[in-house]
Amino acid sequence: MAKDRSGQIELTVTIAAPDDSKDVKIWIPYPVSNNVQDISNIRINGNFSQSGVYGEKETGNLALYAEWTTPTKDRAITLTFNATARELIKKEFPAVESNIPVEIKEYLKSTIFIPTDGKVKEIALSITNDKQKISEKARAVYQWVVENTVRDPDTKGCGTGEVDIQIVKRSGKCADISSVFVSIARAAGVPAREVFGLRLGKKDEEDMTGGHHCWSEFYVPGYGWVPADAADVRKIMLVDKLDLKGAQDKIGYYFGGVEQYRIALARGGRGYYLSPRQNDGPLNYFMYPYSEVNGKSLEWLAAQTDLKYKVMFKAH
């Protein structure tokens, strides 16, 4: 039976803006239930003028949107919900793979954030040219990423996930390492995307403000989406001071497996527009709260300056 973790998550966001401003907006990732997580008892509180939950067309990701249209002091919003997350193990790959469904082929596309040409293509071909099945190619890409990237604890937030930089630098945090996996996988003909989420505390009560996490998943026809978290392998290796040999159990586990201490907030989507559409250009990725004041975005990458947030977890 799959292991699970349950608790209450309380996300509080405050926005520093001029008291007389009439144009302050916030978008917060809004989690939903799926086969490995149950989200319930959602409550929204704050001194905003109005709010709503909106879906983004391309990815289907949801956002809690709120705005302040009258002069206000101390703008704040709190999203509280109950979550139960289950461990996911998907390692029973089919002996024969069918064709990639049409609706999944978009996860093979090259984008400005997820390039599949140049150095990325070169690496993809070099490590998968003797592999036939998608699951085998994905494993080869995963192994390469684990062996050829390192976690940089000084990287801000979860990193920017800029593959053109990371394919040379090969160091960063979870968005960086996961984006490298997605790029190389796509270049090798493996449908892949990022998963943007939040860790659940392991203690009865825990501050999880620094708990945002990005991992990846790939698609095997006839089997579905499969998790792969090379970024967590590299984090564990850094924290526990493990070399590749000492990390073999973790390397094996995180290909096709993720533990119960996380929920997904959003999937895919890089350089896209939220709903309602933000004013200050496309957003790199949607995992942290995003805010605009008078049409200009506040620093959102775990900045904790004008846009501040706190995440508290309380176990059930």
Place the predicted regions along the sequence by residue.
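Acidic low-complexity segments
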Residues: 76-168
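Solvent-exposed loop/turn segments at secondary-structure junctions
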Residues: 84-87, 152, 171-174, 199-202, ...
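Active-site nucleophilic cysteine motif
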Residues: 137-141, 170-185
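Low-complexity, Gly/Ser/Thr/Pro-rich intrinsically disordered linker/tail segments
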Residues: 249-316
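Terminal peptide-recognition signature
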Residues: 26, 141, 216
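Intrinsically disordered, low-complexity N-terminal segments that are enriched in acidic
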Residues: 1-88
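Hydrophobic/aromatic-rich core segments of domains that either
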Residues: 179-277
